[in-house]
Amino acid sequence: MVDEIRAALAAVADPEKAAPMQAYMKSAMPNLGVQKPARLAVLRPVLQRHRLPDRETWEDTVRMLWDGVSYREERYAATDLARHRAYAEWATDPRSLDLYDHLIVAGAWWDHVDEVAIKLVGPLLAAHPDQVAPVLRRWARDPDRWRRRTTVICQIGLRDTTDTALLADCVLANIDDPDFFLRKGIGWALREHVKSDPAWVRAFTTAYRARLSPLSLREATRTLP
């Protein structure tokens, strides 16, 4: 499957788009120039032809595609495989958190981390809060900024099922950090929660107005009614 995915992506490579895409990501890793619609279109038949037999094979395949990367789109494809509907049961298995941690730390940039955080870690947290929340609280204080950003943004999309105590803990663990991606992530997570509970966001931003960075505060309150 891995070789077929790489070949399928290479077959639709667009050199004219590759350089601008790489420049946008500010990454040393080259791009093939395959945008998301084309990537999903070529992946669909490959994933339909190959059905992985068990969770271990699924994880091994995701890791193989991710770790053997030559082009950025191959890692996007690894994430697509990880969150494919055929493997939803394995994706929300608590054992998969170690895989997601690997993708976060090895990916180490916002495009990879945000997808893993919101599309994989968030649903896993929703499925197994008692097992996942303690890990996220540890990550919120980890030296790795991408683990910390994950804890802040992973509940985006959970709406009414958001664990606001966990969200507050993860935000407060990083509220004084000057890192742009943490400050932006805090504002984004709070702004998204406005859609479900504006009163909670208003109370939180009022209570911590003096500590929230101007960027976080501006983003968090931008859509408050």
Model regions and ranges:
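Alpha-helical scaffold domains
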Residues: 1-225
